[in-house]
């Protein structure tokens, strides 16, 4: 199947993403380290979810450097040049969750780094949890491993559809995903009736933004719950919600293998 996004819709999606993102990281463009291979993302014949996500978030960058070489190995020359230039001020690290787990947590050799402190980094990641959960790695453990190895404190997960970058939901420091003014979330039970707050069910995503394709109202195969009683004072006043995974027997696919 194909999703057609015209110029007007694409611009609206970008404007909204920028507004949401700026509330979290700030208004300035920042250098960005992408945990992926440049070759994979420039190949338009194989333009997948990873390439689309990198393309969308690259607009917040004033420089983009890729961690992996054409063979998928860590390019320490590129990485050290990037760290020597940018590690003393705020910078972005972006990638799919599994790529970050595989390359930064598992394979990166600290003794090959010229600068070992990533404390100024804002690490943005999303998708790919299915592969990690098989290894019993949860959000808290994932963040702790990044902090312990690279001193990364600002780890921000996101949830959404790759074709609707303006309807993205970022995870706050309290561990909740937050709906923006341009999107909404409803939780439904197995009979598609609306769940009460705190009850787990099927996630329904609603967005104001799609104009060139029918993406306003989508019933996903993801499971989550809306959190009513919380003390979260993070950015935005939208609904707080949690993601619990996929429906039982749902097709095991996601951004890590699209």
Question: Where are the language model's segments positioned?
Answer:
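Active-site diphosphate/adenylate-binding microenvironment
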Residues: 3-4, 19-23, 41-43
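Short, glycine/charge-rich beta-strand/loop segments that flank catalytic centers
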Residues: 9, 29-40
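Hydrophobic alpha-helical hairpins/lids featuring a short glycine-rich hinge
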Residues: 18, 22-28, 32
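Conserved AMP-binding A3 loop
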Residues: 1-12
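Short acidic (Asp/Glu) patches
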Residues: 10-20, 77
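Active-site glycine/GP-rich loop and adjacent strand/helix microenvironment
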Residues: 29-33, 44-48, 52-258
């Amino acid at each position: 199947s194909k999703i057609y996004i015209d110029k007007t819709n694409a611009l609206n999606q970008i404007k909204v993403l920028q507004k949401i993102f700026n509330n979290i990281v700030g208004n300035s463009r920042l250098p960005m380290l992408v945990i992926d291979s440049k070759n994979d993302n420039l190949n338009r014949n194989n333009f997948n979810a990873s390439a689309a996500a990198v393309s969308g978030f690259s607009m917040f960058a004033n420089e983009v450097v890729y961690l992996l070489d054409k063979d998928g190995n860590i390019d320490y020359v590129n990485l050290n040049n990037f760290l020597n230039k940018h590690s003393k001020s705020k910078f972005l690290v972006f990638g799919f969750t599994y790529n970050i787990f595989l390359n930064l947590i598992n394979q990166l050799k600290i003794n090959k780094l010229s600068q070992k402190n990533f404390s100024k980094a804002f690490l943005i990641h999303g998708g790919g949890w299915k592969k990690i959960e098989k290894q019993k790695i949860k959000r808290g453990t994932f963040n702790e491993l990044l902090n312990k190895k690279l001193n990364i404190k600002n780890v921000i997960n996101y949830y959404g559809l790759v074709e609707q970058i303006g309807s993205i939901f970022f995870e706050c420091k309290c561990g909740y995903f937050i709906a923006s003014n341009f999107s909404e979330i409803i939780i439904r039970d197995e009979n598609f009736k609306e769940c009460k707050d705190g009850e787990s069910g099927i996630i329904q995503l609603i967005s104001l933004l799609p104009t060139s394709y029918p993406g306003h109202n989508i019933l996903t195969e993801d499971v989550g719950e809306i959190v009513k009683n919380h003390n979260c004072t993070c950015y935005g006043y939208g609904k707080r919600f949690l993601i619990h995974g996929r429906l039982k027997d749902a097709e095991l696919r996601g951004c890590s293998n699209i």
